[in-house]
Amino acid sequence: MSHEVPNAIDVRNAVKRYGDFTALKTISLSIRDNEFFTLLGPSGCGKTTLLRMIAGFEDVTEGEIFLYGEEIEDLPPNRRPVNTVFQNYALFPHMDVMENVGFGLEMLGKPKAQARARAGEILELVQLSQFANRKPSQLSGGQQQRVALARALAPQPKVLLLDEPLSALDLKLRKAMQLELKHLQRETGITFIFVTHDQDEALTMSDRIAVMSAGELQQLGDARDIYEKPANRFVADFIGETNLFEVTIKSRDGTRVLCAFLNGLTLTCDAVAGMDVGDRVHMSIRPERIKLRSSKVETENFQAQVVENIYAGTDVQTIVHLQGGMPLAVRTQNSEIGRSMTFEPGAEVFVDVEFGSARLLAN
């Protein structure tokens, strides 16, 4: 008989207030066992507050938090089977790497020999065995990050909390650490809860993402759903790049609606429940879902003029102006095919929006 594994974390109607200020407004979400879960949002959205509530560093004003079915909001941090990796790593400068990693185990009452053996295992996992006798000051930023990870993983917590741990690293090292973190999570089987404001980090590493803004949960889903099917204007604008327009729904035909832009142009897209003819809503079109052509091939092509090409290495962003000077960003790959679809400033072109790429959004 199979037994269903409970969720690693269940947050139920959690509220956090500081005096008259409400930092978290009735948040409910579940994080699965062995999941890489990301809390994503801009500064001040409440993501770190929620992480600290799970860790026990912040009290819960209202609501409940469960860890593998056990209610924990009243437990002190040292009685919760979680560990936290902080943004500043918090390594002990007077201890070498081996001592730093084994410190938590010794505090839990493990014999020194057993603590060193476990520290050696985890250092091998993070590929730092050769640096075991070095002090933190003798390590690079990326190596210090891996020591902090090793120290947090050594006691084998049920959940690992990571509070923007990559923000101090340069771009290339940050990219490498993203892959390493994902690998570590898979190797250890421990649930990771990762806090970041970086959309690329979230999309690269996460099994699922909770997008937060102003203390509220805006959307929860996997990376593809969050990017391809944003729940509202905030998510569409915050995740990746997009063109946002205010439109009016002019007519409906089954599952499709005809929308009019402020400049009078119209575009057909999928209908969305709760939106009716006459409603003024927002439309999102991702730049990579738009093609520029030298001649008209579809009935809904828009005529436009190229204003600027912005070279970005792997791709090129082209800014065009539609009727009435309405700007539109188009992104093409920097490849032979992509270059054949790039036009010089001043060129008259036709804009081809792939059907299904325009998405209507709640305000």
Curated annotation (Swiss-Prot):
<dbReference type="InterPro" id="IPR050093">
    <property type="entry name" value="ABC_SmlMolc_Importer"/>
</dbReference>
<dbReference type="InterPro" id="IPR008995">
    <property type="entry name" value="Mo/tungstate-bd_C_term_dom"/>
</dbReference>
<dbReference type="GO" id="GO:0005524">
    <property type="term" value="F:ATP binding"/>
</dbReference>
<dbReference type="InterPro" id="IPR027417">
    <property type="entry name" value="P-loop_NTPase"/>
</dbReference>
<dbReference type="GO" id="GO:0043190">
    <property type="term" value="C:ATP-binding cassette (ABC) transporter complex"/>
</dbReference>
<keyword id="KW-0067">ATP-binding</keyword>
<comment type="subunit">
    <text>The complex is composed of two ATP-binding proteins (PotA), two transmembrane proteins (PotB and PotC) and a solute-binding protein (PotD).</text>
</comment>
<comment type="similarity">
    <text>Belongs to the ABC transporter superfamily. Spermidine/putrescine importer (TC 3.A.1.11.1) family.</text>
</comment>
<keyword id="KW-0547">Nucleotide-binding</keyword>
<dbReference type="InterPro" id="IPR013611">
    <property type="entry name" value="Transp-assoc_OB_typ2"/>
</dbReference>
<dbReference type="InterPro" id="IPR017879">
    <property type="entry name" value="PotA_ATP-bd"/>
</dbReference>
<dbReference type="Pfam" id="PF00005">
    <property type="entry name" value="ABC_tran"/>
</dbReference>
<comment type="function">
    <text>Part of the ABC transporter complex PotABCD involved in spermidine/putrescine import. Responsible for energy coupling to the transport system.</text>
</comment>
<feature type="binding site">
    <location>
        <begin position="41"/>
        <end position="48"/>
    </location>
    <ligand>
        <name>ATP</name>
    </ligand>
</feature>
<dbReference type="Pfam" id="PF08402">
    <property type="entry name" value="TOBE_2"/>
</dbReference>
<protein>
    <recommendedName>
        <fullName>Spermidine/putrescine import ATP-binding protein PotA</fullName>
        <ecNumber>7.6.2.11</ecNumber>
    </recommendedName>
</protein>
<dbReference type="InterPro" id="IPR003439">
    <property type="entry name" value="ABC_transporter-like_ATP-bd"/>
</dbReference>
<dbReference type="GO" id="GO:0016887">
    <property type="term" value="F:ATP hydrolysis activity"/>
</dbReference>
<keyword id="KW-0997">Cell inner membrane</keyword>
<dbReference type="InterPro" id="IPR017871">
    <property type="entry name" value="ABC_transporter-like_CS"/>
</dbReference>
<feature type="domain" description="ABC transporter">
    <location>
        <begin position="9"/>
        <end position="239"/>
    </location>
</feature>
<keyword id="KW-0813">Transport</keyword>
<dbReference type="InterPro" id="IPR005893">
    <property type="entry name" value="PotA-like"/>
</dbReference>
<dbReference type="InterPro" id="IPR003593">
    <property type="entry name" value="AAA+_ATPase"/>
</dbReference>
<dbReference type="GO" id="GO:0015594">
    <property type="term" value="F:ABC-type putrescine transporter activity"/>
</dbReference>
<keyword id="KW-1278">Translocase</keyword>
<keyword id="KW-0472">Membrane</keyword>
<keyword id="KW-1003">Cell membrane</keyword>
